[in-house]
């Protein structure tokens, strides 16, 4: 909705990493191992990808970050780079709900169609509605991995709420 209303791109570090993984790039292979274990890809890699992306022409009138920044170092790097943010939104969801939503997700790899075992189940359990092919659970959607990711969030990302609430001056979200 926001991207369409303002004619700006959504910048998702997760999507960028998944594309690198799918392409089998060295970054993608390194990222896959870290993500599958529930960890976060190194800040320098993410920051470099984001800086490169926001320098592209379609970002000249703005952009919407999705899932970025995730660490204090990433947030500080964006401020140091002179990137002004108009707003920062925190969506607060209980861990139990996140675990349920993510671990219930199933994907048809060839098309990208996404289902959920409870909220949007396929007509036939474990099968894509269109092709009848198998659905998979991504490694990063497995319950234990989601719980590890949440622990990392609480340790590394929650501090951003405080960081942005205290940010003053020209780089503070308006």
Curated annotation (Swiss-Prot):
**GO CC terms, sorted:** cytoplasm
Residues binding AMP, per UniProt? 13, 18, 39-41, 67-70, 74, 138, 149
The catalytic activity, as recorded, is: AMP + ATP = 2 ADP
* A Gene Ontology BP annotation from the UniProt entry: AMP salvage
Query: What pathway is it annotated to?
Result: Purine metabolism; AMP biosynthesis via salvage pathway; AMP from ADP: step 1/1
Q: What class of enzyme is it?
A: transferase
Query: What does UniProt say about this protein's domains?
Result: Consists of three domains, a large central CORE domain and two small peripheral domains, NMPbind and LID, which undergo movements during catalysis. The LID domain closes over the site of phosphoryl transfer upon ATP binding. Assembling and dissambling the active center during each catalytic cycle provides an effective means to prevent ATP hydrolysis.
Which HAMAP family does this entry report, sorted A to Z?
A: Adenylate_kinase_Adk
What is annotated about its quaternary structure and interactions? Monomer.
Q: What does this protein do?
A: Catalyzes the reversible transfer of the terminal phosphate group between ATP and AMP. Plays an important role in cellular energy homeostasis and in adenine nucleotide metabolism.
Q: Which family does it belong to?
A: Belongs to the adenylate kinase family.
From the Swiss-Prot or TrEMBL record, give the protein name.
Answer: Adenylate kinase
The record lists the organism as Neisseria flavescens
Q: What is the lineage of its organism?
A: Bacteria, Pseudomonadati, Pseudomonadota, Betaproteobacteria, Neisseriales
Chain's gene name: adk
């Amino acid at each position: 909705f926001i991207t369409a209303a303002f004619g700006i791109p959504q910048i998702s570090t997760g999507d960028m990493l998944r594309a690198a993984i799918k392409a089998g790039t060295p970054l993608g292979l390194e990222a896959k191992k870290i993500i599958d274990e529930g960890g976060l890809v190194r800040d320098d890699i993410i920051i470099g990808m984001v800086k490169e992306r926001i320098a592209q022409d379609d970002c000249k009138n703005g952009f919407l970050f999705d899932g970025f920044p995730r660490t204090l170092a990433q947030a500080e790097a964006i401020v140091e780079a002179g990137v002004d943010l108009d707003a920062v939104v925190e969506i607060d969801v209980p861990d139990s709900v996140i675990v349920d939503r993510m671990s219930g997700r199933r994907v048809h790899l060839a098309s990208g169609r996404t289902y959920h075992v409870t909220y949007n189940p396929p007509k036939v359990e474990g099968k894509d509605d269109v092709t009848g092919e198998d659905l998979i659970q991504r490694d990063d959607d497995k319950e234990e991995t989601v719980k590890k990711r949440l622990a990392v969030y609480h340790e590394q990302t929650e501090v951003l709420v405080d960081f942005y609430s205290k940010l003053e001056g020209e780089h503070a979200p308006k």
